[in-house]
Curated annotation (Swiss-Prot):
Protein name as annotated: Uncharacterized protein R852
Domain of life: Viruses
Pfam family, one: DPRP
């Protein structure tokens, strides 16, 4: 059974950041998924420069992987939401599909439908695109700061700084405060000219 990694446009991570063993993957499939380019279910007006940049980055990532000896397939956008799923089913049949958490509800829903329709095994991995893991967030919501279920930026910020020992002196914040937001709220003086 083949190990296939599906890489969506927001998952162009360096090899060392991939949450699975890159050498255990038989084929990488980089897909221009319709949710990131143009989709019938979620109509969004994308900035043309963003689309050009996204495609260029994906093509670069294709070269990045192939230059390192990995077997890579690039699927161009067709407008079909099921593009990658039909491709995998047609060309590989049943396989282990390695997918980094897409952090997108509609895409997760499509992946689940594909898994059910084709009896496909999906192996999910936590996204390395975030500092905090899902477990970290669950721990925070169960902690004293999060136990009251009223989530405020200040309490989260203090918890985060303590957890990662950022600007901390033992158990106390350097400078005596966790946040200096009130100093960041001054308006730009009129005498300063800003050219756009």
């Amino acid at each position: 059974m083949k190990n296939i990694a599906v890489i969506f446009p927001n998952q162009l991570f360096e090899i060392s950041y991939l949450p699975y063993d890159p050498d255990s993957i038989d084929v990488y499939i980089i897909v221009e998924d319709s949710l990131y380019f143009s989709d019938n279910e979620r109509f969004l007006r994308f900035n043309l420069l963003k689309l050009i940049y996204l495609r260029a980055a994906m093509k670069y990532y294709y070269d990045y992987l192939t230059d390192r000896g990995y077997d890579v397939i690039y699927l161009d956008w067709t407008g079909e939401p099921s593009l990658v799923f039909e491709y995998v089913s047609k060309n590989y049949g049943s396989c282990n599909l390695n997918i980094i958490d897409p952090v997108d509800y509609l895409l997760e829903e499509r992946i689940a439908e594909f898994s059910d329709s084709y009896n496909q095994k999906i192996i999910y991995y936590e996204s390395p695109g975030f500092i905090l893991t899902n477990l970290d967030l669950k721990q925070y919501t169960g902690s004293k700061q999060g136990a009251n279920k009223k989530f405020f930026q200040h309490s989260f910020y203090a918890w985060f700084r303590k957890k990662f020992d950022i600007l901390m002196d033992g158990n106390k914040p350097i400078g005596g405060k966790y946040s200096y937001d009130k100093y960041n709220r001054q308006t730009i003086p009129n005498k300063i000219f800003i050219s756009f």
